[in-house]
Amino acid sequence: MKNIRLWLTYHDDKQIEEYHLKEDEYIKLFKGNDVTVLGENINYLNRFYSEIVTFYYVWKNNLKTDFVGFCHYRRMLPTICEVDKGECLVYHINKNVSVFNQYKLSHNYQDMCDIIDYLNEKYGVANKYSEYILKGNVLVPCCCFIMQWEDYVNLCEWLFPILFAWDKKNGLNMDPEKYIEKARRDFRYEDVNYQCRTVAFLAERLISCYIVTEMKPFSIITV
């Protein structure tokens, strides 16, 4: 195979042994909460962004390979392969699931409404992205995929301005204390340590949105 790099995110050294994580000619381990890593990063927000900090690091530091992929310590792609331009190998595809309702049942749907408002402001009311979130029934979960580098750059250039606009709208200013304060307000009777990952949950749906509306996803596993 050509130049392929699959970035595997973890956050605790114990996970290396527990999940048998190791690097090889294709896989590169990345500790998402390592704030000493060289290069531009947002690893100090790993608690809230989860593996999205790895996406940012690879993109911002132009760690280019012909094909780039991502997974994390609990989910690995069943295969590693080359893909054509515009194609995307994903972990799996959930069909016949309401993207919006599935989010609404699990998280604070007002955050997703903020995302939809931003998309409508930027791309016009009833644009294909907000329509996907509101009416879509195909979900590509888990943020595990392989695509060509140019496609990945296009994804990041679309994704991160949306996430940072949500941060700004909610007055969070990329501040960990403000992120956890918001989670405690929104989920004061629930699992705050889980729900504080709002931006990661939003990113998961946005990545699915981009892959479904702009690319040709395929998977070894279809649910």
What are these model-predicted stretches?
Residues M1-V223:
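ER/Golgi luminal nucleotide-sugar-dependent glycosyltransferases, focusing on the catalytic module
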